[in-house]
């Protein structure tokens, strides 16, 4: 009887799986998705595997493509705002704001100070709501169900506040070119302050639920490491880039609106609890950012001008027809930099060209590097740490 070969699997210091074998094997093609619970939408991954080890993972996109940029060429400037809600549908306020910043830059109009504080406040509320979804669903991906329930319990408070201000729970159409649709209700700031006081201890609770879970830590620590220089070369942004130790945040490094007047920190991992650039680091950044958003919201409440004689649409143009030119504007969204390039011919009330720069698309492009040398179950942890929304990836 012929002697059987053997395979030995081990991990290097950087947690990449190493296979030592003295028998012939061949790679196998494994498809994940486009209908798979771990891909957070209609994402397909074509993985080449050597046993349980992934040698390559190629994302296939387009299953949710809706021609957003082409629609922008046949819709007038204000009419595009509701379409932006449907890109990253978990952060509609942030999408609207990024688009409006670009058009306002093209029009060269000044925004009322109260409007600026309202925009910051509702966008930071939306940032927290988005991170709660990211943290809750990440727990489910790795087998922890309870944090999901806690996250959605607290997210409900935020959705109620945003519904009170805008009339909608997810697709808001609240931030308009030059202003906002409505002034916030009389007791809105009071209710927001009550939420801030309620949620501060909950942030600590949610943090401990996962970071003190030994299984969660072992599934994420040292997995999917992305060095800072490679992350920069991929043009990563948001929690993904900060998770690699790069302290880059547009609210601080390229500030817009009233962010220069606000005091807040940019959380980055210190390497004591996680390996810088791994899945756990990216999770920690999102958890810590919620605390900073609460600080920003409190400052907005205290610094916001009064509503006497205030018209939320005072700077909203009756007809938007920018002069001929082009502009690029960007904003710090929950998943990274969302940018809009807009080109105007100076004659039409519709953009000649509107290009959206999606952070989710850029972050997902590194999937091949993130997955190489990892085990198949680790792919679930890596995808969840990217926190993609396919509505923004495909547009």
Curated annotation (Swiss-Prot):
Coiled coil: none
EC nos: 7.1.1.-
Any Gene Ontology CC annotation: plasma membrane
Top EC class for this record: translocase
Pfam families membership: Complex1_49kDa
InterPro entries, per database record: NADH_Q_OxRdtase_suD (IPR001135), NDH1_su_D/H (IPR022885), NiFe-Hase_large (IPR029014)
Compartments in which it is found: Cell inner membrane
UniProt key word Translocase: yes
Molecular function in Gene Ontology: NAD binding; NADH:ubiquinone reductase (non-electrogenic) activity; quinone binding
Catalytic activity: a quinone + NADH + 5 H(+)(in) = a quinol + NAD(+) + 4 H(+)(out)
Keywords assigned: Cell inner membrane, Cell membrane, Membrane, NAD, Quinone, Translocase, Transport
Summary of the function given for this chain in its UniProt record: NDH-1 shuttles electrons from NADH, via FMN and iron-sulfur (Fe-S) centers, to quinones in the respiratory chain. The immediate electron acceptor for the enzyme in this species is believed to be a menaquinone. Couples the redox reaction to proton translocation (for every two electrons transferred, four hydrogen ions are translocated across the cytoplasmic membrane), and thus conserves the redox energy in a proton gradient.
UniProt record similarity statement: Belongs to the complex I 49 kDa subunit family.
Subunit structure: NDH-1 is composed of 14 different subunits. Subunits NuoB, C, D, E, F, and G constitute the peripheral sector of the complex.
Protein's recorded name: NADH-quinone oxidoreductase subunit D
Organism: Chlorobium limicola (strain DSM 245 / NBRC 103803 / 6330)
Lineage: Bacteria, Pseudomonadati, Chlorobiota, Chlorobiia, Chlorobiales
Gene of this entry: nuoD
């Amino acid at each position: 009887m012929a002697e059987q070969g053997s395979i030995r699997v081990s991990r290097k210091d950087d947690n990449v799986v190493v296979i030592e074998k003295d028998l012939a094997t061949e790679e196998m093609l494994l498809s994940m998705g486009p209908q798979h619970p771990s891909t957070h939408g209609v994402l397909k991954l074509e993985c080449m595997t050597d046993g349980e080890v992934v040698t390559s993972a190629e994302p296939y996109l387009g299953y949710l493509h809706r021609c957003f940029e082409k629609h922008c060429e046949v819709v007038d400037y204000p009419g595009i705002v509701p379409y932006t809600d449907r890109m990253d549908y978990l952060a509609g306020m942030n999408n609207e704001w990024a688009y409006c910043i670009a058009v306002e830059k093209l029009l060269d109009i000044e925004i009322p100070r109260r409007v600026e504080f309202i925009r910051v406040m509702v966008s930071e509320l939306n940032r927290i709501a988005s991170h709660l979804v990211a943290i809750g669903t990440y727990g489910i991906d790795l087998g922890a169900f309870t944090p999901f329930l806690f996250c959605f319990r607290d997210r409900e408070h935020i959705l109620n506040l945003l519904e009170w201000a805008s009339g909608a729970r997810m697709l808001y159409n609240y931030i308009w070119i030059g202003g906002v649709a409505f002034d916030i209700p009389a007791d809105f700031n009071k209710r927001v302050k009550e939420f801030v006081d309620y949620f501060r201890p909950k942030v600590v609770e949610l943090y401990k639920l996962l970071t003190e879970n030994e299984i969660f830590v072992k599934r994420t620590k040292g997995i999917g490491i992305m060095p800072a220089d490679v992350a920069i070369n991929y043009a990563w942004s948001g929690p993904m880039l900060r998770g690699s130790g790069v302290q880059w945040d547009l609210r601080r490094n390229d500030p817009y609106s009233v962010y220069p007047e606000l005091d807040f920190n940019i959380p980055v991992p210190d390497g004591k609890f996680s390996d810088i650039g791994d899945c756990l680091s990216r999770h920690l950044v999102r958890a810590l950012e919620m605390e900073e958003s609460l600080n920003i919201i409190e400052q907005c409440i205290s610094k916001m001008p009064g509503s006497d004689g205030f018209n939320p649409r005072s700077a909203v143009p009756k007809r938007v027809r920018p002069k001929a030119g082009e502009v690029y504007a960007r904003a710090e969204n929950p998943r990274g930099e969302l940018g809009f390039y807009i080109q105007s011919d100076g004659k039409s009330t519709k953009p000649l060209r509107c290009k959206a720069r999606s952070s989710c698309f850029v972050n997902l492009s590194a999937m091949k590097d993130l997955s190489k040398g990892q085990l198949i179950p680790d792919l679930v942890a890596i995808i969840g740490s990217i926190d993609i929304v396919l509505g923004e990836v495909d547009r």
